[in-house]
């Protein structure tokens, strides 16, 4: 065994001081000293359990001891009588075996393949034992779940990712999917449950048993987000539901995930074979599937963006040439050819890599380099994580951890280790780039003329002449030269390394050539240089613009068209990644796909990392806003569609924020116990105003109210029990906090909750019954007007139906025409006095007479006035479709309804485009005179004369 290096021998003295009396220095072997010096996790564990160290010394870990895990664990669980005891024994067993694995790994007593096998088998053993114990307990409580033939139905668990592949790392969360075979009901219990209820409750308890931190720690962090529909989907699915989902809706990334899926425990049973046979056609196509290459290119881009987004330069998993890229290389061949080549259908990476070499899909040399690099990186990753049982893949910056890793990896010092590491990662990156290169090699652009380089590098004065700017007017030319000079002065104030200078000197002549070809060269250049000032110290982004000419062209055209986009890109340079693919840049996500795209985006972030989750939500929103604005500028989205996209995006965000808040609240307090008798969460979010009316703009805030249906006597079922209604209040407060927290990527949305019953003085969250009572007995007419533009944007079907019924009932109340007309008109006059135009000789598109608010008041008045006679008027919450309904129900002439619709969309279109120009919502007094006259005439007809 290699002796400890000098820094570690010094650290050993610190370790000795921590050791209790029974672990005196003289009683320890050289092996024990080495492991205790290397791993704080082992050190802490044997201090708490000295008998484990005795066991390690007398019975050192063996390569095949994973075969005994199940028997050892059964013995530990033999006297467990309740769930608390189960949780304690599982946690202690996991810790004891992890100490043995860390010992074997640190001292290199077994191969790295054996370590991966032991880690994976330990996880499987713990998962299966917990499942089987809970299944028996749940059957005693609720009866045994059976199919129509009375056959008992098991819970099958798919282990995904590295767990499925038998390649789990030392400190890893586990990705699981739960399934059961057939529908039916429980038999033999005190009360009958259908199988879906039984397995959902059991699944929740299983996650709690494995995941919930106690004084003994946790077993594994459980991640269920890979299941169909992610967090918004059922926790457990029947085989039929799984099959429907993967056949009808399965995405490419879900195919990649399913390659490694493995059934935990008894995998040879009838149901296990049925599940495997059902999933195989989805994962492995019968033909050679080259269609997957474009998806893989997209994923390659996603990896590169991930590295940039999170600054993962020292990350041995996600960085260039890291573990993820080796996994990716192997999956390329599995997904393209796996359907035809059974040898490529292995879940484990190394056997698949051997099969790839045997089929001559990679050269023997490349395959061997990847194999050696993979084992090197996995050993380094596992050693790094075993120091503190910490889930990290980032190389350390502190000297002690570096010394530990260099010693354990058998290097003299850290520079030696990083030298070999760099060589391995370079080999991986080379194969990765060769395998998934772009369709066409980039044509080498002809070198720019010397004059463009002179313009950038020679700092010409305002009165200098240069032929390349001769086509510009004198003023424009002077402005361009001044902007270049100012930009260079800004650069002098910043610390830019040699590589950054080199990239900038390559980029700027190209950029100036493209910008100065435009008539608005000075304005465009001023916006782009402001952006560049923010990113000059981040060479990665400069390289992106330098290496992808198409991205540079998109940047120039978007900044020229919209200062809003330019300032967004300047504030959040991560968005520059969106410029790489024009197919997505000018094609916003399908309106019904925002939730799924966001779910996929959030999968890359640990569920328990609130800070990263908040960042990811904001980054996703900004990227989608950019794509919507780009399509708007390009003219591919009409105004109605712009608002549709902005509204669907907001709803996806609300969905994700509620999910995040719910998970946090349930972890803290448990769930309100009235939910045990029903599906769902007993919670709804109602959107008012522009959100409710599908009319959001680029900078709109969200008008929200929160409802629940929690009984007065409900309590939560967690260890920190609180009143059920208090739970929903804290949930709503948490949602508001998640929306408004300012991170480096800004806030998510401004949220206004003042439209709730009793306004700012009322409770933040209201029971459904109290809301109905308030609307019937206390609400003012303007609150009923607001209800016209309200709809549930998140919520259970029961609460949604309840809200819709209350809304319909309130809107169809009989109202006296003159009184209503007076109240609506007076409210509008108050608003105009308060919000009307403060700018002389300007027309405020929204607030002034003849503007958008007048049209909204006309539609609201007519719905409240006539819905008693024509209940169909309550169907929609947006102005355009309400105007259609008014015409269809013979309340307004079709010609007037169409004219008001045209005026409304024209004015809204102008507001969108003013927002893109970062201009306020008012225009010259002589604009839109025809539209304003038309609106005034309608106002006079309905709210003055009628």
Swiss-Prot record:
Required cofactor(s): Mg(2+)
Positions of the UniProt region annotated as Adenylyl transferase: 449-946
Enzyme class: transferase
Catalytic activity: [glutamine synthetase]-O(4)-(5'-adenylyl)-L-tyrosine + phosphate = [glutamine synthetase]-L-tyrosine + ADP; [glutamine synthetase]-L-tyrosine + ATP = [glutamine synthetase]-O(4)-(5'-adenylyl)-L-tyrosine + diphosphate
Family: Belongs to the GlnE family.
PANTHER family linked to this entry: BIFUNCTIONAL GLUTAMINE SYNTHETASE ADENYLYLTRANSFERASE_ADENYLYL-REMOVING ENZYME (PTHR30621:SF0), GLUTAMINE SYNTHETASE ADENYLYLTRANSFERASE (PTHR30621)
Name of the protein this chain belongs to: Bifunctional glutamine synthetase adenylyltransferase/adenylyl-removing enzyme
Lineage of source species: Bacteria, Pseudomonadati, Pseudomonadota, Gammaproteobacteria, Enterobacterales
Gene designation: glnE
